[in-house]
Design a protein with these regions (language model features):
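ATP/Mg2+-dependent ligation/transfer catalytic cores
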Residues: 1-190, 207-211, 215, 219-222
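Short, conserved helix/loop micro-motifs enriched in His/Cys and acidic residues
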Residues: 193-205
Length: 223
């Protein structure tokens, strides 16, 4: 959109959708089981798009979090424009955004995972005067049949290269998709923990992200 993601506005989102033939919008948000949930919207017209971007959409909180009772389960998921990205896997042109939870009174859901984290970060800042920087990483195993060619040494796979590391290309493809979706990647590499057992190769890989600065001003949950 020609500007840093943190500066994205509703007008930017609407303009991008209009100019790039985007036909669908996805809202995504984590539930109590730790998995991302998805709500799909077809863009009917400009007014409808403006409505969902402004007001979000109602969801059944009791189906998302075990601690919310069915009798008072109305929650709203409101998109954070700074998280917008083109879905690299969608066959229909789709713009996806992560959302924050709000209760029926328009207040941030106090028990929502992201809001809980932001409150903790604000308390940390108030007590210490320091800012908290979080740096995450993905560590995973790729499991495949052992073809017996150029075997890697067990537990010696740190920063290994092909042909001893078999799945570097898969890792770099994953990194490209993550970057396309707005992820800020520091680097990727093969990890120590590779081994072979029962005719299968287990290769450990890592994708590490750049530090992210969480500012207390984001407590409102709309940035």
């Amino acid at each position: 959109m020609g500007k840093p993601a943190k500066e994205f506005t509703k007008a930017d989102i609407c303009h991008f959708i209009r100019e790039n033939g985007i036909r669908m919008v996805n809202f995504m948000y984590p539930a109590g089981d730790g998995r991302l949930k998805t709500l799909n919207f077809v863009i009917n017209n400009a007014l409808y798009l403006d409505t969902i971007l402004t007001c979000g959409e109602r969801v059944d909180g009791s189906s998302l979090f075990p601690f919310i009772e069915a009798g008072s389960s109305d929650l709203y998921v409101v998109p954070r424009f700074s998280t917008a990205f083109l879905d690299p896997f969608a066959t229909i042109p789709t713009l996806t955004m992560l959302c924050s939870f709000f209760n029926k009174d328009g207040e941030p859901l106090a028990s929502a995972p992201r809001y809980t984290l932001l409150k903790a970060l604000q308390a940390f800042n108030e007590v210490t005067g320091m800012q908290f920087e979080a740096m995450g990483e993905l560590e995973y195993y790729v499991i495949a049949e052992d073809e017996g060619l150029f075997p890697a040494t067990d537990q010696k796979g740190y920063h290994e290269s092909a042909p001893y590391a078999k799945f570097n290309e898969f890792r770099t493809e994953c990194m490209a998709y993550i970057a396309q979706a707005g992820g800020q990647i520091k680097y990727g590499h093969s990890e120590v923990g590779n081994f072979t057992i029962d005719g299968l190769v287990y290769e450990q890989n890592e994708i590490e992200f750049l530090p992210v600065l969480y500012m207390p001003c984001t407590l409102c949950g709309t940035h």
